[in-house]
Amino acid sequence: MEHERRGVTRYNFGAIAEVVDLDGRGEVVSLTRDFSYSGAFVKTTTPLPTGTRVRVRITHSGAEFAATGNVTGNVIPTGMGIVFTEIEASDRAILERWLGVQS
C-alpha cells in the first residue's frame, strides 16, 4: 500500500536500515516502515534527535542504498523520519528500481 504525505508518495517498504549520526553521537540499526524518493521512516524506540545529520544505509534484496540526510522528527515510541539531502547517482538508480520507476 502506498500513501501520500507532504506531497510525496510513501511506499510501505520493510528493509534493514543503519542510521549513523555524523557527529558520532550514536547509531541505530533497525527496519524501515516506509520509503519514498525523498526519505524514510525508520522504526526504533531510541530515535536520534530532530535535526541530527545522518548517513543512512538501507539493505534490501541483495542491494544497498546509501544517502546523507537529516532526522526530521520523532514519533515516540515508533521511530524517526529522515529526509535525504544527498544521494549519489548510483544510489538514486537503486532507489528507483526498488520503488518501481522505469528510467
Regions found by a protein language model. Name each.
Residues 30, 67-72:
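Short beta-strand-centered aromatic/proline hotspots
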Residues 22-24, 37, 74-79:
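Short, conserved beta-turn/loop elements at beta-strand boundaries and strand-helix junctions
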